Amino acid sequence: MGTVSSRRSWWPLPLPLLLLLLLGPAGARAQEDEDGDYEELVLALRSEEDGLADAPEHGATATFHRCAKDPWRLPGTYVVVLKEETHRSQSERTARRLQAQAARRGYLTKILHVFHHLLPGFLVKMSGDLLELALKLPHVDYIEEDSSVFAQSIPWNLERITPARYRADEYQPPKGGSLVEVYLLDTSIQSDHREIEGRVMVTDFESVPEEDGTRFHRQASKCDSHGTHLAGVVSGRDAGVAKGAGLRSLRVLNCQGKGTVSGTLIGLEFIRKSQLVQPVGPLVVLLPLAGGYSRVFNAACQRLARAGVVLVTAAGNFRDDACLYSPASAPEVITVGATNAQDQPVTLGTLGTNFGRCVDLFAPGEDIIGASSDCSTCFVSRSGTSQAAAHVAGIAAMMLSAEPELTLAELRQRLIHFSAKDVINEAWFPEDQRVLTPNLVAALPPSTHRAGWQLFCRTVWSAHSGPTRMATAVARCAQDEELLSCSSFSRSGKRRGERIEAQGGKRVCRAHNAFGGEGVYAIARCCLLPQVNCSVHTAPPAGASMGTRVHCHQQGHVLTGCSSHWEVEDLGTHKPPVLRPRGQPNQCVGHREASIHASCCHAPGLECKVKEHGIPAPQEQVIVACEDGWTLTGCSALPGTSHVLGAYAVDNTCVVRSRDVSTTGSTSEEAVAAVAICCRSRHLVQASQELQ
């Protein structure tokens, strides 16, 4: 695969110069020396122009995107993405059409790569003056300017991720990831290092930019420290997590640890093509790099994930919201932040690990001992979210070796389930990010674990909505997950509740902002439940003092979640919480002026119960948790009055937050209860009893 390196700008060519390029030997040779065989390119475009009619000049419906971080932009190189249903042959036809129309206007363009296996589109080098023309071409969905990506690196780590039963001896987990292949997109790798010798295949793939301040590439073997270290963390003989996993190395970062979005996309397509040509067992792709938010990068990750590939990436080392970076912001990617030996967030000078709702979990990422490229027996200590991501890639390889049929959703849920919980000091994170950032540090599952029919659930937060009254936020579950409940949260308390809606064949959680509000979050409880069938039952506002109630009507369906939505701006106060009458079926109870929604599901062996915890006096926080063996599927506040900020699930605990009672003058009439719905599968109970 060729190297994509040049980043020079393109300028319009006047007709005399264009003729000179076509006819003048000296001019043609000069241009060839600079940019390759452009004389042939121009002649070809003349021929192409004769054979292609211009498309009708409709207004552009496609959109243009570029990196929000100006220093990382690479103007002059663009990824043109075609619409989803576009036939494969149209990628090359559209590229030729662009070249022909650009040549007619006196511009040269160069097609650097045509995507066939990852997404429909192509990579083109051209003047920014041609963007309007390109956006009007048939089949074009959007165009994204290329941008830079960077490596994210600035033996306690193995002990931290190992279950307690292993620690008395040494780190020797079963199977060692031998059934899994890990692709590493990084710098090159010193494959003869004793840690990884015989475990790594360095592919011939290379797509890296020129180094800053130079006009050449150093040999890969002269700058393979980052990739060598990460390869050792994943599967090194002494310091590796998955000692049996095999690695394949793709070079997408240069000697300065810098690459491009386009180069990484071509690397991902290389993996997809390899997967199609020679299908193998489970694949893990490690992306220990970060760039600014990129729609096309995230879309490519989604395509690869839906093809069955597990992608693990670094959250980034910018002490910032991970949702502002790619591929960390891609929902289909497992995004990993970094912690130190004390399970605290890693600080790197004035920066540190990224955080926020786009992070799935944390892993060891400070002073990690691994292979050094200085010599074949050298080791070095490195820090960063790249190292943390390498740990999780190793754990993923271990899990997939034990259960090769796991889907991405099942693997992610297990990573979350077996993580160490509530060990990170949240004060390190900005105040507005603490509730959004998962307090989880990755760990291997115990060897005696049997997943069976265990019910796994996780909490997914939406992006923050806008501040207008009609603004909404939407939280979505992954492709193989089921939305079992929906809640909302607003720091100002000004919200109009939430409800489950159907969108594109999937259920989503939609939260509603209120007048004067600062925005709202939607919070989805996403679970793995085979053969599940769910529906929503709604009761309109009762208008009576007893409140609004609704329960599951269909036989065999059980209550998995409650939500409420109201149109009035202020629900006002409510007498002490109206709890579920004892002895009656599980039901959702809410404010008399609110519509109440019950999420009702049927699945083999599924049983659920409601747990409530109310405090007579107003409290800023009320919690209720499910017992061992039960999984939290629903979390709501009762009643959902306007002084309640919202409800959300943290692992197996339902948390209800209210306004600061010391400043609001709240009374006992504004007391609130936390309502948890806890579910389990009888199949799991029976299986556990049989093992005892």
Swiss-Prot record:
<keyword id="KW-0645">Protease</keyword>
<dbReference type="GO" id="GO:0005737">
    <property type="term" value="C:cytoplasm"/>
</dbReference>
<feature type="disulfide bond">
    <location>
        <begin position="457"/>
        <end position="527"/>
    </location>
</feature>
<dbReference type="GO" id="GO:0005615">
    <property type="term" value="C:extracellular space"/>
</dbReference>
<feature type="disulfide bond">
    <location>
        <begin position="562"/>
        <end position="588"/>
    </location>
</feature>
<keyword id="KW-0378">Hydrolase</keyword>
<dbReference type="GO" id="GO:0008203">
    <property type="term" value="P:cholesterol metabolic process"/>
</dbReference>
<keyword id="KW-0443">Lipid metabolism</keyword>
<feature type="modified residue" description="Phosphoserine">
    <location>
        <position position="47"/>
    </location>
</feature>
<comment type="similarity">
    <text>Belongs to the peptidase S8 family.</text>
</comment>
<dbReference type="InterPro" id="IPR041052">
    <property type="entry name" value="PCSK9_C2"/>
</dbReference>
<dbReference type="InterPro" id="IPR000209">
    <property type="entry name" value="Peptidase_S8/S53_dom"/>
</dbReference>
<dbReference type="GO" id="GO:0005783">
    <property type="term" value="C:endoplasmic reticulum"/>
</dbReference>
<keyword id="KW-0325">Glycoprotein</keyword>
<dbReference type="InterPro" id="IPR015500">
    <property type="entry name" value="Peptidase_S8_subtilisin-rel"/>
</dbReference>
<dbReference type="GO" id="GO:0009986">
    <property type="term" value="C:cell surface"/>
</dbReference>
<feature type="glycosylation site" description="N-linked (GlcNAc...) asparagine">
    <location>
        <position position="533"/>
    </location>
</feature>
<dbReference type="InterPro" id="IPR034193">
    <property type="entry name" value="PCSK9_ProteinaseK-like"/>
</dbReference>
<dbReference type="GO" id="GO:0004252">
    <property type="term" value="F:serine-type endopeptidase activity"/>
</dbReference>
<keyword id="KW-0256">Endoplasmic reticulum</keyword>
<dbReference type="GO" id="GO:0034185">
    <property type="term" value="F:apolipoprotein binding"/>
</dbReference>
<comment type="subunit">
    <text>Monomer. Can self-associate to form dimers and higher multimers which may have increased LDLR degrading activity. The precursor protein but not the mature protein may form multimers. Interacts with APOB, VLDLR, LRP8/APOER2 and BACE1. The full-length immature form (pro-PCSK9) interacts with SCNN1A, SCNN1B and SCNN1G. The pro-PCSK9 form (via C-terminal domain) interacts with LDLR. Interacts (via the C-terminal domain) with ANXA2 (via repeat Annexin 1); the interaction inhibits the degradation of LDLR.</text>
</comment>
<feature type="domain" description="Inhibitor I9">
    <location>
        <begin position="77"/>
        <end position="149"/>
    </location>
</feature>
<dbReference type="GO" id="GO:0032802">
    <property type="term" value="P:low-density lipoprotein particle receptor catabolic process"/>
</dbReference>
<dbReference type="Pfam" id="PF05922">
    <property type="entry name" value="Inhibitor_I9"/>
</dbReference>
<dbReference type="InterPro" id="IPR037045">
    <property type="entry name" value="S8pro/Inhibitor_I9_sf"/>
</dbReference>
<keyword id="KW-0765">Sulfation</keyword>
<keyword id="KW-0865">Zymogen</keyword>
<dbReference type="GO" id="GO:0006915">
    <property type="term" value="P:apoptotic process"/>
</dbReference>
<keyword id="KW-0458">Lysosome</keyword>
<dbReference type="GO" id="GO:0005770">
    <property type="term" value="C:late endosome"/>
</dbReference>
<feature type="active site" description="Charge relay system">
    <location>
        <position position="386"/>
    </location>
</feature>
<feature type="region of interest" description="C-terminal domain">
    <location>
        <begin position="450"/>
        <end position="692"/>
    </location>
</feature>
<dbReference type="GO" id="GO:0043523">
    <property type="term" value="P:regulation of neuron apoptotic process"/>
</dbReference>
<dbReference type="GO" id="GO:0005794">
    <property type="term" value="C:Golgi apparatus"/>
</dbReference>
<dbReference type="Pfam" id="PF00082">
    <property type="entry name" value="Peptidase_S8"/>
</dbReference>
<feature type="active site" description="Charge relay system">
    <location>
        <position position="226"/>
    </location>
</feature>
<feature type="disulfide bond">
    <location>
        <begin position="486"/>
        <end position="509"/>
    </location>
</feature>
<feature type="disulfide bond">
    <location>
        <begin position="534"/>
        <end position="601"/>
    </location>
</feature>
<keyword id="KW-0967">Endosome</keyword>
<dbReference type="InterPro" id="IPR041051">
    <property type="entry name" value="PCSK9_C3"/>
</dbReference>
<feature type="disulfide bond">
    <location>
        <begin position="223"/>
        <end position="255"/>
    </location>
</feature>
